[in-house]
Amino acid sequence: MAYTDKLRVVYGDYTLGVHGEGFDYIFSYAQGGLESIVKNGYEWLYRCPKPTFWRALTDNDRGSKFHIKSGSWLSADMFIDCKGIQVIMDGKEQKQYAPDNNSYGGDVYADEIIVTYTYETITTPETTVLVSYTVDVSGKIRVDVHYHGVQGLPELPVFGMYSHHRPLLIYLYKP
């Protein structure tokens, strides 16, 4: 890699690649999230992490009919939709990525890139969640998640990010 102290950014038709020393990340426009994390040749993700709003019911939930009162969050959890993507590279918003601009831009390097996805729930009334991934030259990813609640929504069972990733096994050797 020509600039080992910079991120190499690759704009694709459906993805944005961010590459550095020992890591490769792919952000999907179509899937609406971080699609691939490869560190030292090992793939960590099975699919894009997404906001989650639902949890397993307890007996108390069933007794109080919580699942009836807050059931719209189960639908929001299953059918969340990505409505927008924003890419900021070294503090400047980028308009270069597809599908708005499908021309090849040549080699692009950056010190930091922030990819923000705006998700919209199918609740009534609807609300939004912003998920931002900030990548620096060391390969660290900072994830910021912001839920924008609105009046009139039922009680929220849980809020977080759900991720499918490969298991990690650590073997410790003690003499």
Question: Where are the regions a protein language model picked out?
Answer:
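Beta-strand/loop-rich accessory regions of lumenal/periplasmic or secreted enzymes
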Residues: M1-P175
